[in-house]
Amino acid sequence: MSIDVANESGVPADEERLARLARYILDALRVHPLAELSVLLVDEEPMADLHVRWMNEPGPTDVLSFPMDELRPGAPGRTSEPGILGDVVICPQVAARQAERAGHSMQDEIDLLCTHGILHLLGYDHAEPDEHREMFSLQNELLAGWRRSLEEEER
C-alpha cells in the first residue's frame, strides 16, 4: 500500500503517525494492498483556495477529499480492487480551532479529519440522515480501534 503524507503547512505534524493511521483504516476496510493514498497538510490560504475552487464555499475548511478511482471497501474475506484512492487535504490551523472547541488535542482532531476524509474517498457521505449515521458510526468505530492499537503499542 502506498501512502504518501506531506506537510506543506507551517504547523508541525506527526507525518509517520498519519501514515500509520491511514494504513490502519485502509486495512480495517479491506482496501487492496496496492491502493495509493495521499494525505496533504496545508495552511489556511491554500485550503481556502481549494474550498472555493471545488466546493464554491468561502474560507478555509478542515478537510477536503479528492477521489481518483472509485474504490470501495472490500467485502468480508476480499479486498477491494487496486487503484488510486485519491487525496485527503487537511488544514491544521482549522483543526486546532475545532480541537479546542471539542476539548481534545489537535492530533486527535487531525486523526478524526484524516479518517473522515478517507471514508469520503471510499464513497461514504453524510448528506442524508441514514448516510450520516452510517458514516459517523464507522468513523467512531475506526477511531476507537486506532486509539486501542496506540494504547497496546505503549504497553
Curated annotation (Swiss-Prot):
Cofactor(s) in the UniProt record: Zn(2+)
Family according to the record: Belongs to the endoribonuclease YbeY family.
InterPro entries in alphabetical order: MetalPrtase_cat_dom_sf_prd (IPR023091), YbeY (IPR002036), YbeY_CS (IPR020549)
UniProt keyword annotations, A-Z: Cytoplasm, Endonuclease, Hydrolase, Metal-binding, Nuclease, Ribosome biogenesis, rRNA processing, Zinc
Annotated source species: Thermobifida fusca (strain YX)
Name of the protein this chain belongs to: Endoribonuclease YbeY
Binding site for Zn(2+): 116, 120, 126
Pfam families named among the record's database cross-references: YbeY
GO biological process: rRNA processing
Main location: cytoplasm
GO molecular function, one term: metalloendopeptidase activity
Coiled coil: none
EC number: 3.1.-.-
Function of the molecule: Single strand-specific metallo-endoribonuclease involved in late-stage 70S ribosome quality control and in maturation of the 3' terminus of the 16S rRNA.
PANTHER family associated with the record: ENDORIBONUCLEASE YBEY, CHLOROPLASTIC
